[in-house]
């Protein structure tokens, strides 16, 4: 990549924000969303393998700092959180685990078996997604009963621009070699879309 291309690429991207403290779920969502975009957007990664490895290493360090700040935030705020906030915390944790998997040293041409070391993370993502869908179903069930409608978890999905559980479930299905975990992720993905 030429200097001009590198300058053009870097001038269009905001740096991943420094994170030492999280003060709200909105901040946690916004900062993790930015990290997601660095990992997820096709074609934005450096073409040089050394640059890719260096960027993934920087993101792994950032994700460790985010997790520590998020854990500190939960310790100080969780007792006063309502059900919707707790659901959002689960969504954020599922996305954090997913970012950690994507930022790993496993290369872009990896097979699902190359991700076997993340099986506990895949399992945790599925369990978090189940809890999110269960909470959303409980939230909409009283409304459905009173109106006679048939609502699905997608009816109470987060606002556009917020992280949700679809992308983490997709990564489980794309990267997990455990058929049982894959099957649960697939069913939850369909359920979360109301299918």
Where on the chain are the PLM-derived regions?
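Structural helix-adjacent loops and short alpha-helical linkers that scaffold large soluble proteins
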Residues: 177-182
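TPR/TPR-like (Sel1-like) alpha-helical repeat modules
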Residues: 189-194
